[in-house]
Amino acid sequence: MTKRFKALLFDAGGVLVLPDPTVLGPLLSYYGGDATLDAHRRAHYAGMAAKSLAGSGELFWDEYNRSYVRSIGVSDRNVEAAALALHTTRNAWLWRWPIPESRAALAAIAGSGLPIGVVSNASGQIAEVLSRSGVCQAGEGPHVSMRVVIDSHVVGVSKPDPRIFDHAMPFFDGIERHEIAYIGDSVTMDIGAARAAGLHPILLDPHDDHPDADFERVRSLLDLN
């Protein structure tokens, strides 16, 4: 698939890193939730699907929280309490658990020489988190090298505003926007913004939560190779 594009841009949360299940597992097991890694990996995408279905913007996570805790098996009578606990615990710095398949895929893509970068709605922390979690960094370093890591807090514009991508384009000089794919996990935030910016949107949809989508989907970043 990568041969179709001259560059790739990635969202960070839900694509490269997840809310840390080693923190959320014990937290939500108190309410009867399954604490396993697999359960929490699944729960994130269930939450994102519910968030997209509701058309919720970046600041609204109620549907995500409820769907997340239901996905890990919290009973109806405990959903609101568990969702509140998730809401008060999940913050920007908790999006730090590296997705193993994504790390492997990034290494392979970078090894092919394809230009890559990150464009993420974040809180000023994402470059440090991606580096500390062993995923990537902007420029040379111990992990996968990105041409740029764009943090919405730093540049002052966030998805779904397509202007966030304007800050990445100078790092991909000579490449037309339609030749760049953007991979995200949110229909409302990522797909719409990428389309509006003239990029080719791809949704990371590991559990086929969007079977009727009118956009391209992959189950894993490994499918990009």
Go through the PLM ranges and name each one.
Residues 1-10, 98, 103-110, 114-225:
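Asp-based, Mg2+/Mn2+-dependent phosphohydrolase catalytic module
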Residues 2-104, 111-112, 123-124, 128:
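N-terminal helical cap/lid subdomain that shapes the substrate entry/recognition surface
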